Every structure is written in C-alpha cells, then in structure tokens.
C-alpha cells in the first residue's frame, strides 16, 4: 500500500461496501461529506468525483469542513468542473447533479480557509478530462 492508513466517507452504503471489500484495512464510514464528524485531522484530504455533486452553497461551506479535517501542512485535492455552472449527467441510467464555482471563487475560498493552491489543471487529459485542484494548508 502507498499509505499508512485511510479513512473514507461516502453517503452510499454500496460504495462503502465496495471499499471495505477492496481495502479491508481502511476505516470506511457511511456519512454525509458535509458533516462527517470524524473528530480528527489528516495529512491528505481527497474529494475525487464527489465534491462537485454538491450545490454551490454547499461547496462554499465545505471549505470549513476541509479545513477542520486537514492537518497543518496537509494537502487537499478535489475535482471540479472547468467553469461556474450546473449540469445534469447520468450514472447507471439515473440523473446525476454536478455544479462548480468559477476558478477565482475557489481560489478565494482556499485562501480564506488557510490553503495555498499548489496546482490547478483544467480538463486534465491525464485524469480523464477532470479539472483538478491541489492545495496545501498553511
């Protein structure tokens, strides 16, 4: 394994079951990412293909959650859309909501919550066209 320990949160019991099966040594919790109540900080926080399913206001509020759960000097990585907006996609034939703020607002939120942006790649071909943010807590 490339990590010492991992804690994962998802609101879907099915997704958590898949994680438990694949990585049985992980700490997997069914919870809402907006209020996970983990009561600990981590060296890295990743919200890959998850954060952008929250509406704009919830995304803004998430920066306090990210800050609460990131240890000093720790990293935060998440994916977003390439620009401000909302869209409805599909997953397994069901509609799936997506939203993103614009880059300037994300940068302001990072700064206001004590993070410095380390990298930002819009529609990264190496990541399947995802827009990726990486920041470090000051």
Label for each model-derived stretch:
Residues 46-47:
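A conserved beta-strand element that flanks and buttresses the S-adenosyl-L-methionine
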Residues 53-54:
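A short His-aromatic
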Residues 60-72:
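A short glycine-rich, Lys/Arg-flanked "PGG" loop and its adjoining helix->strand segment in the class I
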Residues 73-80:
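Conserved beta-strand signature within the Rossmann-like core of class I S-adenosyl-L-methionine
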Residues 98-113:
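Short alpha-helix
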Residues 113-114, 122-138:
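Core SAM-dependent methyltransferase catalytic element
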């Amino acid at each position: 394994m490339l990590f010492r320990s991992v804690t994962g949160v998802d609101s879907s019991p099915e997704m958590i079951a898949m994680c438990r099966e694949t990585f049985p040594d992980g700490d997997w919790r069914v919870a809402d990412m907006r209020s996970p109540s983990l009561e600990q900080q981590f060296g890295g926080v990743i919200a890959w293909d998850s954060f952008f399913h929250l509406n704009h206001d919830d995304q803004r509020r998430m920066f306090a959650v990210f800050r609460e759960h990131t240890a000093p000097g720790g990293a935060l990585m998440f994916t977003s859309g390439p620009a401000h907006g909302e869209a409805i996609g599909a997953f397994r034939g069901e509609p799936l909501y997506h939203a993103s703020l614009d880059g300037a607002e994300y940068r302001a939120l990072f700064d206001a919550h004590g993070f410095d942006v380390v990298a930002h790649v819009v529609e990264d071909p190496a990541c399947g066209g995802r827009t990726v943010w990486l920041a470090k807590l000051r």
